[in-house]
Amino acid sequence: MINMRDNPTMHVLQASKFLFLALILIQLLSTQLFAQRSKSPWQTLTGDAPLVIARGGFSGLLPDSSLDAYSFVSQTSVPGAVLWCDVQLTKDAIGLCFPDVKMMNASNIQDVYPKRKTSYLLNGVPTQDWFTIDFNFKDLTKVILKQGILSRSAAFDGNSYGISTVKDISTQLKPEGFWLNVQHDAFYAQHNLSMSSFLLSISKTVIIDYLSSPEVNFFRNIGRRFGRNGPKFVFRFLEKDDVEVSTNQTYGSLAGNLTFLKTFASGVLVPKSYIWPIESQYLLPRTSFVQDAHKAGLEVYASGFGNDFDLAYNYSFDPLAEYLSFMDNGDFSVDGLLSDFPLTASSAVDCFSHLGSNASSQVDFLVISKNGASGDYPGCTDLAYTKAIKDGADVIDCSLQMSSDGIPFCLSSINLGESTNVVQSPFRNRSTTVPEIGSLPGIYSFSLAWSEIQTLRPAIENPYSREFTMFRNPRERSSGKFVSLSDFLNLAKNSSSLTGVLISVENATYLREKQGLDAVKAVLDTLTEAGYSNKTTTTRVMIQSTNSSVLIDFKKQSRYETVYKVEETIRDILDTAIEDIKKFADAVVISKKSVFPTSESFTTGQTKLVERLQKFQLPVYVEVFRNEFVSQPWDFFADATVEINSHVTGAGINGTITEFPLTAARYKRNSCLTRKDVPPYMIPVQPAGLLTIVSPASLPPAEAPSPVFTDADVTEPPLPPVSARAPTTTPGPQSTGEKSPNGQTRVALSLLLSAFATVFASLLLL
């Protein structure tokens, strides 16, 4: 028998054999991992679905790090959603879950301890605030949490949420995944507080699944002390120009040395801009950061997701579209998303990823455009209609207007000043006041010939520019061409995906009586010329109006579908009124607030309007759906898809009228809708549900109920005959010296139009 201790050669051979076997084992494991990933639709490092990480719980709604914010995650998110806790230390070394070492923004501490504001160097910058290190935990039991982002509801601040410890969150909620983030390890060390000691101590009773920090030294110090069974270490990147304190390198520089990070971390957490850079709020080409990190064996988690944050214009104010661009773009998937709204992240992962362009519809309702895709382009232009068709609209609409020479065309308003640059044009002198239309002066479509209107530039409408300074797609704010009704009908007829068109006819009585223009005849004649009346096209035609007299006139002269629009917000409708509507209309349009009444942006209940109208076999279409989060009640979590789901699946409406057809069309292909067990993030919201968790002192005031729609609201006199028209004239630009009949220069009108032009330019064309 050979003694290996006495035979060095055999010893080396045996060691080589073990090394060889180890290499084979590693290769086999790598091959298995690659095979697992290649079979998965996910292009994450492991092939698993991206992780949903709830920053401070559901902090987009409830105060960050409150117990309710954390507990709400399990009720609204995918199984396995991870709770994120920003760990702060108190003076007596108790670990808290609190969003920052500075306390003023997210609590009422300045009210409780007004004289205990201090100043410290934080990341090298002198900073004044109330710091956790100046208070024992007992002191902080008197402090309550509040919403730290002003664009979010403060109604829940009155719930007196206390500050929770790390142990509280773990023991009371038992999260499936728990992520601790240590943002200021060096700062605590400077004040004789050891974050490492706290974490090692708490890990004996609390399971820590992930541990992140933006400081390299933190991982160097704690890494070997946790051992193999410790949490996953994730290095957190700050902005590219920020300097990492222990290496004195910028984070942008560290992003180019991923192999170094792999020596102590299994993953990296980066701001979204490392992956999708943005310039002037538009996306630049995506980087190779995710692929590079995956090659280095690092998982990539993306941060900075919030439904109410400023999104790139490319996403059309749709947070779901942003999530999908980071996980389902054909090139890579991030391994996790850090979000204030885990519900939206969950639905992106589980319901809307990997649908493909040919995914079939899972729910039956009509997606009807509102002036085309008017959230992305100026309404009623060729670009808005083309995008609406491309985005999956079932029906495109034309808001009918008439030019002075009797040409019917599509434009969102009869007042050209609301959607064109007319007040900056040579036609600005054609302003007039029409009491039948509005109390303020305007430049109306019937004051210009079609050839003159075509010289104007369209203007995108910005419904939230004044109150919220939110502007739509500024690069395309004046793009596109105006579309005649004839061109609109031909565009629709030549589309293979559309099922129909909707033509909205308003102000017909005024146009007949005062302008000698017959909108009804113009529509019918154009439909005939375009081949819609002789069945040469199968495209469905719907005529909409708020006037029963208009629809009755159409019914007498054609067989097109008619749609009655209830202009007012109502809470109910009499059966007799429905019976009257049924005589001349095939469907009804109502507002969102007529389905879900609101008070101070909270839903207060649900009416029975949809159910009552449908009982009389009248389909119900609801308007107007927008992506901007400020257009939605808090109950819908700043997510247009949640709002659509609650109206379609919850209220049972038959169609959405939307300025962003893509959002509604994508919802129709939602893979979660046909499951036996619908996940919580795809269950319609409970009307007035949020009000049940608002403290009585913070409840919004009761509002006067909306009216009940009656027979009298429906009944109208018939349309008047068309008056004789005066000879058509096309006055040119007015000189500054033109005299009025009394010999005075029209200074007052010029001043009025100048002010009108200034307001228009500031609101629409900035």
Curated annotation (Swiss-Prot):
One GO term describing the cellular component: plasmodesma
Tissue: Expressed in roots, leaves, stems, flowers and siliques.
Ranges in a coiled coil: none
Residues in GP-PDE domain copies: 50-349, 365-668
Feature: compositional bias, Polar residues: 726-743
Catalytic activity, EC: 3.1.4.46
Any matching Pfam family: GDPD
Extracellular side of membrane: 36-745
Principal location: membrane
Catalyzed reactions per annotation: a sn-glycero-3-phosphodiester + H2O = an alcohol + sn-glycerol 3-phosphate + H(+)
This protein's UniProt keywords: Cell membrane, Cell wall biogenesis/degradation, Glycerol metabolism, Glycoprotein, Hydrolase, Membrane, Repeat, Signal, Transmembrane, Transmembrane helix
GO molecular function: glycerophosphodiester phosphodiesterase activity
GO BP: any one term: glycerol metabolic process
Glycosylated residues (UniProt): 105, 192, 248, 257, 314, 358, 429, 494, 507, 534, 547, 654
Region (Disordered): 704-743
Domain of life where this protein originates: Eukaryota
Residue intervals passing through the bilayer: 746-766
Gene3D superfamilies: Phosphatidylinositol (PI) phosphodiesterase
Annotated membrane topology: Single-pass type I membrane protein
Family named by the database record: Belongs to the glycerophosphoryl diester phosphodiesterase family.
Role of this protein: Involved in primary cell wall organization. Required for the accumulation of crystalline cellulose.
Protein name, as recorded: Glycerophosphodiester phosphodiesterase GDPDL4
Organism from which the protein derives: Arabidopsis thaliana
